[in-house]
Regions:
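Small-molecule kinase domains that catalyze NTP-dependent phosphoryl transfer to phosphate-bearing small molecules
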Residues: 24, 34-79
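Short glycine-/acidic-enriched loop or helix-start segments at secondary-structure transitions
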Residues: 21-24, 42-44, 98, 157-160
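Flexible, charged surface loops at secondary-structure boundaries
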Residues: 2-7, 25-26, 52-53, 80-83, ...
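Short, well-ordered beta-strand core segments
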Residues: 31, 56-59, 86, 113
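Phosphate-binding beta-loop-alpha motif at adenosine-nucleotide cofactor sites
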Residues: 12, 56-67, 146-147, 170-172
Length: 190
């Protein structure tokens, strides 16, 4: 329900011993089975328990919690919250080859990029796409499991003294700079 209301990632952690009860929650995008316990303390639950038939990753006993977290981050290409990260901020109406080239340059800087999508849908005719539609365009154009966040219509960025990051403009060359989002929207009929 939270995912439907907010259109964001939701993580659910619970013990659900049967396939039937798991199916009642719907199909998750990612299902991780943490299979550490051979037998629980409740005999009735042990008797009815069914191993998941379809999981994306099974974690067995023997790993530390930190090792489990690193395995999940690596397996699903999730962001490492402590690693240096490059921020791309834009409308991406729609995501196109120029944005893709910029993301590739951003990845070269730190190896991890957050794509911050400004919430501008409906502000003008140049902003027809919702956040969800923008993320779909990003995914369709070669970005596997993009780390995107929805942000307000940010129009100004200010900072005080040197605070440990830099703001830089990347020159992608005349051919990339010539790409027009307006023309892309016309081509796509949006």
């Amino acid at each position: 329900l939270a995912r439907l209301l907010e259109d964001e990632i939701v993580i659910v952690d619970f013990i659900c011993p049967t396939n039937e009860t798991r199916e009642a929650f719907g199909k998750p995008d990612i299902l991780i089975w943490v299979n550490r316990i051979e037998e629980g303390r409740f005999e009735d639950t042990n008797k009815m328990s069914q191993d998941p038939t379809d999981c994306d990753l099974e974690i067995k006993a023997g790993l530390t919690v930190d090792q489990e977290v690193q395995l999940i981050i690596k397996q699903f290409k999730l962001p490492d919250w402590k690693a240096p990260t490059t921020l791309l901020l834009g409308r991406y109406q729609p995501w196109h080859e120029g944005h893709q080239a910029l993301k590739e340059k951003a990845d070269e800087r730190t190896g991890q990029t957050v794509i911050a999508v400004r919430h501008t849908q409906g502000i003008s005719e140049k902003d027809p796409l919702s956040y969800k539609e923008v993320v779909e365009f990003i995914s369709k154009n070669g970005v596997s499991r993009p780390f995107t966040i929805k942000v307000p219509n940010i129009t100004n960025i200010v900072y005080g003294r040197d605070v440990g990051y830099k703001i830089e403009q990347v020159d992608l060359g005349a051919e990339i700079h010539a790409i027009s989002a307006t023309e892309k929207r016309k081509e796509l009929g949006i």
